[in-house]
């Protein structure tokens, strides 16, 4: 978020479970497709917001399980916690706002009188959220009775039922929709109101997102019954809210195209990357394209041919260098020559590469320094290195692509490869 000095071109606000993340997609293909699209075309001038019912603890667990990008803003615990950046700095103003007519002790006292409510795990109990499980056929009656009792005790709360079993009690000012409205107001006060905002969800606790004025919305194909019922009652004829035909992250990509919010072809959907025609030099796209080629090479999905290696050498300066995370420095061309040895070595394995936080900085009239995290996943093992790449447009055309002149990598703390010799680029 700090990299933006003006309004974001697009702000995507997405739920995680069964929206951005498809738990029925073991290869995480739709998520990886979105990742490549975002890093290649949007990261530099847009905002990615994850809005989840998960607590910080469970959110961090999900990030370890799935190949997720780092969001600019994270809204957690059903809109009761807002944090910023990779360091997840809390929004103190939002916390203070939620304290109005909220008393967690009273909520606990009143809910203890309902044996039908089963308290969720301790990690899901937050300062401004008390969470339970409840049977579907009991939810409506309990919600009505409990709301009345809490109001009589002087509280102003909202009770959200979602997922066919989850019941969350929050301050009235909380919730995913209120958190989004707060963010939009804050960005507007800073002169950075996004040009377009797209809200994405699949369950009842996402409904509020679709009621915020001037926000586009997509309910993914696998949206739950309670959200579709809300749409039928509140937004059936709205041209700004669609029910996608694609699941999860694929549905988000579909919505970007439907509303004409920007590029909607993921680099992962381009069969021949040499066919990509760009109007200008786009350093982030070059980085994404390079590592997608490397993934396909190691998975044996592209032919082991001299032509591919020649094309790779053509975008590298002959004197260009690569500093391996171990500290060893080599010429880029020598590194490319060694790729013969690893062609198809990950064939049949769950091997994926993705890049995160791709941020280009123009450091000269014809050069860019691009920083990012490069991740590799093979089975259950994942490694990551902090990478900086120096790219040049000197003596090349847009059709040729940028020239790689230097690559430098260092291991991300706690994510180093057990065998450094197996790490290429």
Curated annotation (Swiss-Prot):
Disruption phenotype: Plants show chlorosis, inhibition of photosynthesis, reduced growth rate and altered photosynthetic carbon partitioning in favor of starch. InterPro entries: HAD-like_sf (IPR036412), HAD-SF_hydro_IIB (IPR006379), HAD_sf (IPR023214), NTF2-like_dom_sf (IPR032710), SPP-like_dom (IPR006380), SPP_C (IPR013679), Sucrose_Phosphatase (IPR051518), Sucrose_phosphatase_pln/cyn (IPR012847). It catalyses: sucrose 6(F)-phosphate + H2O = sucrose + phosphate. It comes from the Eukaryota. Pathway: Glycan biosynthesis; sucrose biosynthesis; sucrose from D-fructose 6-phosphate and UDP-alpha-D-glucose: step 2/2. One of its GO terms (molecular function) is magnesium ion binding. GO terms for biological process: sucrose biosynthetic process. Belongs to the sucrose phosphatase family. This is Sucrose-phosphatase 1. It comes from Nicotiana tabacum.
């Amino acid at each position: 978020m700090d990299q933006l000095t003006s309004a974001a071109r697009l702000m995507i606000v997405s739920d995680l479970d069964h929206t951005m993340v498809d738990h029925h997609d073991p290869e995480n293909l739709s998520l990886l497709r979105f990742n490549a699209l975002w890093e290649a075309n949007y990261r530099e001038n847009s905002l990615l917001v994850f809005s989840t019912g998960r607590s910080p603890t469970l959110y961090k667990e999900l990030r370890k399980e799935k190949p997720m990008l780092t969001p600019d803003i994270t809204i957690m615990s059903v809109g009761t916690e807002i944090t910023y950046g990779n360091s997840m700095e809390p929004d103190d103003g939002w916390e203070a706002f939620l304290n109005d007519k909220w008393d967690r002790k009273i909520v606990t006292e009143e809910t203890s009188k309902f044996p039908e409510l089963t308290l969720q795990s301790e990690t899901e109990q937050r300062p401004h959220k008390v969470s339970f499980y409840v049977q579907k056929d009991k939810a409506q009656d309990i919600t009505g009775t409990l709301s009345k009792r809490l109001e009589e005790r002087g509280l102003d709360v909202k009770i959200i039922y979602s997922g066919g079993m989850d019941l969350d009690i929050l301050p009235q000012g909380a919730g995913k929709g209120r958190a989004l409205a707060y963010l939009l107001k804050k960005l507007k006060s800073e002169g950075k109101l996004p040009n377009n905002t797209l809200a994405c969800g699949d369950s009842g606790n996402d409904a509020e997102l679709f009621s915020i004025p001037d926000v586009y919305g997509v309910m993914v194909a696998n949206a739950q019954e309670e959200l579709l019922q809300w749409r039928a009652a509140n937004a059936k004829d709205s041209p700004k809210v669609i029910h996608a035909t694609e699941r999860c992250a694929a549905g988000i990509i579909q919505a970007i195209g439907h509303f004409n919010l920007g590029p909607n072809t993921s680099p992962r959907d381009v069969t021949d990357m040499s066919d990509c025609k760009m109007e200008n030099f786009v350093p982030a796209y070059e980085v994404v394209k390079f590592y997608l080629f490397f993934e396909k090479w190691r998975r044996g999905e592209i032919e082991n041919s001299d032509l591919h290696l020649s094309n790779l050498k053509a975008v590298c300066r002959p004197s260009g260098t690569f500093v391996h995370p171990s500290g060893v420095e080599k010429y880029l061309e020598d590194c490319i020559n060694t790729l013969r040895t690893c062609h198809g070595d990950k064939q049949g394995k769950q091997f994926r590469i993705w890049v995160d936080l791709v941020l280009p900085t123009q450091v000269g009239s014809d050069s860019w320094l691009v920083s990012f995290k490069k991740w590799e996943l093979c089975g259950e093992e994942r490694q990551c290195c902090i990478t900086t790449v120096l790219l040049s447009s000197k003596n090349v055309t847009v059709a040729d692509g940028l020239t790689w002149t230097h690559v430098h990598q260092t291991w991300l703390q706690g994510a180093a490869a057990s065998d450094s010799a197996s790490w290429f680029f």
